[in-house]
Amino acid sequence: MAEKTEILNSMDEGKTKSAHSGVSRREAIKLGGALGFGTLGIGLFGCGTGGSKSESWDETVDVVVVGSGSGAYTALRTQHAGLSTIVLEKRDTSGGATSMSSSVVWAPCNDLMLAEGKKDSKEEALTYIEAGTGDTFMPDLAAAYVDHVNAAVKNCAELAGIKWKIWPSSIDYLSFLPGGKTYGRSLLPDAGEGKSSIGVLSAGILAAAESEGVKFMKGTPCTALVSRTADDGTVEILGCVAKKGSKTIRIRAKKAVVMATGGFDWNQQMMKSYLRTPARHSWGCSTDTGDGHKMAMRVGADMNMMSEGWLSPGYKKEFDESRAAEASNLSSLIMDDAKRGIIFVNKHGKRFTNECANYDSVGRSFCAIENDGEERGWKNLPAFAIIDQAAADSHTFNKGELGKPGESFTRFETLEELADACGIDKQSLLAEVSRYNENAEMGLDPDFQRGQDYYAQQSTYSSKGFEGAARTLAPLTTPPFYAAEIVPVLLGTMGGIKVDSSARALDTDGKIISRLYAQGNCAGVGAGGSMYVGGGGTIGPAIAFGEIAASDIETLSDWK
């Protein structure tokens, strides 16, 4: 069988020779172009298994995992199963976005909720996901998630010592949909009394993986996949190429390579090309630049849901200032938007969302397109959060003090002054606030039903001591007033490598790319569609598909 080995974007020009053909890199590029491969990469041609000789590899292991966020779980699983595993990490520290999260996992039908007598079923979970994802619903991927997430939860407990408990605020973000639940599906590690769970899951998995013998190569980005193509067009991954400083390292993966490189929310060009949201800020890892996506595309992988993202609202000033340094915390607006006496308005002076809905739904509300008159663009940008002094005296906003909101806010004596300074339609804003105030006095929001759903009423950040919708509604009547510009913010991009229900990468014809797997924000999975199901809705599918990948890899024989 004639085979083509491709080593993409990796080797020093003119230095590498094929073990079979003696073709230099420069010559191979010319030959590849003549045969229609263009600038895809280097073509090393000949019979047999090019690149399989021991002298052509610097390292040989069973599995290479690219990325140490959710990928660390997969590495733990494969190493524990007796498969030697290397993790390549672009950053100088391990953990990725998982280490920055609250460690919550959305796990329907989990043992803890069932032990408390709460009813749940696979059918209910899939009904909920289908209702929330609409035409993006992928039943095979959704079912794979629900079928395997609890195995991942159990393995985190058994292998990494994670002690799970039901998250007290365990409310499905769209619990009003068919199949939604108001308690039990979201789990988080028990970090101890009064301690934060941020990073606990990641730390536990990383420690266990290192103890098992996983080799972590930090500050060592993967730069290319090594593949070969059979006569029938089937692509098989043989390993990868990494860089450590100026050194190139070629790693043979006898069984598989798993892509877990995160999203592309720190790649402005990719965001502009793919996303259908105006979000251009992220609190994810600054190394999430779409590396895994691009490497997979170069070996023919298809992409899925590239227009989608995990969203939230954020104070623009916070993210403008953190852009170079990388935001390491959730925007404080996520904790502010359910408080009494805050509203969001667009440049037209109109409210455009239920401010205390779940953060992903609020983030998506920025995506409306302007179709009125001659204007085109994003209808709800620029946008502003507005509070009055009564709200400021009752709650802290933007990490400020009682009576004095944080630095994102600017003080104005009147709403008219505020509108002029912010470029908001003045008359429209005055009318909108008047209407909002009238309804708020009665505990009503006929426009967006704010505070009427279970999620809002049980929100950790809504005002205690009030009943029903009044927990989140209060009129804005007490000057001075404060305004802060707000923007949609990415928790991460959702789209990535198209995979099947075994986490195997697929090409543009729907064929399996042998020995290439993907998980997390590098895989186009979401929750089996575009939806933020609830707390832990990103980590849940990430480790579920890590579990799926590890289980499938265990069945593979070595490539020859």
Spans of model-derived segments:
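Conserved redox-cofactor binding core of oxidoreductases
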Residues: 147-248, 268, 316-317, 440-467
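N-terminal secretory signal peptides
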Residues: 1-27, 42
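Rossmann-like flavin
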Residues: 119-179, 411-414, 418-435
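N-terminal Rossmann-like FAD-binding beta1-loop-alpha1 element of flavoenzymes
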Residues: 63-86
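An anion/pyrophosphate-binding glycine-rich loop and adjacent beta-alpha core
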Residues: 293, 302-424, 428
